[in-house]
């Protein structure tokens, strides 16, 4: 296990990506990583956006190969207060899998869909399955956790947007979304996210609940 602290304000910008790349010298992430973000109070940003941009910085800095090859598991957390930054911790997939979710699951759903970036039809089908599973319950509120297992062979990160963007039936719509933006859920409420690579042919699985 190796830890590396990157100070600064985590964002989805190129400036943050460059800061992470500059701090990545000598670090090798391997098959699993945990990213613990600290943000100023009231900062409104999706955890998966922070995670993806930070991983890009780690890749740029040589800590990860192209397309995040070999990365099979990720945990990303965010909290308000304290000195802004991210702590990068290298782990093993077994360690990540052994972590207990920080609360009971309000929804546990599987699907035979294979999430692919740019496939709006898949995203719509996944959203329909989530709506059917959630039924007419009110959206989840507060600090949330999500656990995603995806049967993908390529990048573990690229398909994640497809999975999370369809969560509007469960999380409600983010008021920042404009009318033309079809997918804009309140996924900024997710403060603990685990993403794992599932076996080829396995089902896509999402569990989500309140922390």
Residue ranges and their predicted role:
Residues 1-211:
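Acidic, proline/glycine-enriched N-terminal capping motif
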């Amino acid at each position: 296990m190796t830890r590396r602290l990157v100070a600064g304000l985590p964002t989805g910008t190129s400036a943050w990506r460059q800061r992470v790349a500059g701090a990545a010298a000598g670090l090798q992430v391997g098959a699993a990583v945990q990213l613990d973000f600290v943000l100023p109070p009231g900062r409104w940003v999706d955890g998966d956006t922070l995670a993806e941009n930070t991983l890009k910085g780690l890749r740029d800095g040589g800590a990860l190969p192209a397309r995040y090859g070999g990365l099979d598991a990720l945990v990303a957390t965010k909290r308000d207060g304290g000195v802004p930054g991210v702590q990068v911790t290298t782990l093993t997939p077994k360690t990540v899998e052994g972590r207990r979710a920080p609360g009971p699951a309000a929804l546990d759903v599987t699907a035979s869909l294979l999430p692919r970036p740019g496939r709006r039809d898949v995203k719509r089908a996944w959203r329909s399955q989530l709506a059917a599973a959630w039924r007419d319950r009110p959206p989840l509120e507060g600090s949330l956790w999500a656990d995603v297992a995806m049967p993908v062979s390529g990048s573990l990160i690229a398909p994640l947007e497809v999975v999370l963007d369809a969560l509007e039936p469960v999380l409600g719509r983010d008021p920042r979304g404009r009318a033309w933006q079809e997918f804009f859920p309140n996924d900024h409420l997710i403060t603990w996210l685990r993403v794992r690579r599932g076996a080829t042919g396995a089902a896509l699985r999402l569990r989500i609940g309140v922390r």
